[in-house]
Swiss-Prot record:
Keywords: Cell membrane, Lipoprotein, Membrane, Palmitate, Signal. It is found in: Cell membrane. Residues 28-57, 148-158 have a biased composition (Low complexity). Residues 1-28 form the signal peptide. The lineage of its organism: Bacteria, Bacillati, Actinomycetota, Actinomycetes, Mycobacteriales. This is 27 kDa lipoprotein antigen. It comes from Mycobacterium intracellulare. Pfam families: DUF5666. GO terms for cellular component: plasma membrane. A lipid is attached at residue 29 (N-palmitoyl cysteine). Residues 28-60, 138-171 are annotated as: Disordered.
Amino acid sequence: MSASCAVPRLTRFAVFAVAGATALSLSACGSSNKSSSTSTSTSTSTSTVTSAAPSSTPNAEAKVSGLIASVAGNSIQVTKEDNATAAVNFTSATKITEAVPAGLPDVTQGSCLIVKPTEGSAPGQPVTAAKVKISESVNGTCPKPHESTPGGASSTPPSGSPSPAPAKPAWVRGSVASVSGDTINLTGTDASGNTTQTTVTVDDKTKYTKQTTANTEAIAPGKCLSARGTTDSGGALQATSIKLRQAVDGKCGKPKQPGQGG
């Protein structure tokens, strides 16, 4: 009886041993799979982090303003207000204009004016001109600004903050309807497209400049430049238009806003 009982005990021991070995094998496979998965995930993550960012899109609209440092052939090196440099290229098709000193006799019927009012001028009222910028119309029409005319706009300050300084008078622009003595009548268009009439008075303190057509010979070191065009793949501006003006004490100051000339 005792010999026959020993056989089943040995059989049960063998079954338990096989089951244990199978469990250990499955556990090892699971660990191997997890390790492989972790390795794959780490590799993917590393690849994502080290991928390079795309370069800037060429042919994007751009502008460059600053002091002309040098001119070589059809390429201009410009020193910007922040002392960074920029390359501007031009061709025979580039429109070039230059602001030159002018006077009241240059203000004629049909010419286009951009007027900076003196301090204290009220919106919608006759203004006294501190500066007058003159340009010729194109097909009988004065060009529209690229952006809003400076001045006149103010934002509401946060509650409890000090009262802001009064907004500077907005620049006035339009076509000269008539000139009589020291009075200029301008016809313009407001933001809603409605026709406006503005009376502008000038005095002996009013300063005048006139935008005249220029050629490539006018592009010279020491002048201020404002150019518009598109950037090429190398980052240079391919200029479609260039505006020039004289520097003041070798400086150009901050880039002029649309409506301020230059």
